[in-house]
Amino acid sequence: FKNILPDWNINLDIVSEPIKDNLRKLALAKVLHTYGGMLLPSSFACFTDLISIYNAGVQNNCMFVGELLNRDGAGPEDKEDFCPSTKMMGCAKDCPLMKEYINFMELINATDYTDESVFIGEESLWCLERVRENRMTLIPSEILGSRDVNGKILTLEMLLGNSYIDLDDKAVGIYIPDQDILRRTAYQWFARLSAGQALSSNTMLGKYLT
């Protein structure tokens, strides 16, 4: 990060988890604040150009986050299936709300040396509060391919099965739960496939990726 962030002087190679993950999030937030742009998880497969999502996200509130399935025990106390996730976020250059998020992450890095922030869902709760205040835009899960057209959660069983999945017409991509694939023994076979094998597999995910 030091090549694109003049004030970044932390060597992440010598930092251990979970501090390393929080510092990486902080650095990415600073990149977005400095240059503007959009952050996507590596397991998000795009169907189309995302410029319309970016423009809609920054139009009124300057910063936006995606609504993704809560798989980490994080989020609000009412245990919503979906919650705001900074795995997918973006902003305009010099966004003041992103600066607030940076300050928030710096506080976490200064005080939290465990995985507690993941389980409590501090980031999700921070974002949710600002979404409710209409200061932050939430990109709906249907648009991000985490629910079908009827609002049903796209489970790993559905994605790696061969029954038809009816996505929303406005879906710009599909979010692949990569950590679930690695965690669940029954589906680790998919992680071992080559790119070509994954695309030609008899799965709905393979069909949507081609």
Describe the predicted segments one by one.
Residues 1-24, 42-210:
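Glycosyltransferase-associated regions of secretory-pathway enzymes
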Residues 25-37:
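Small-residue hinge/turn detector
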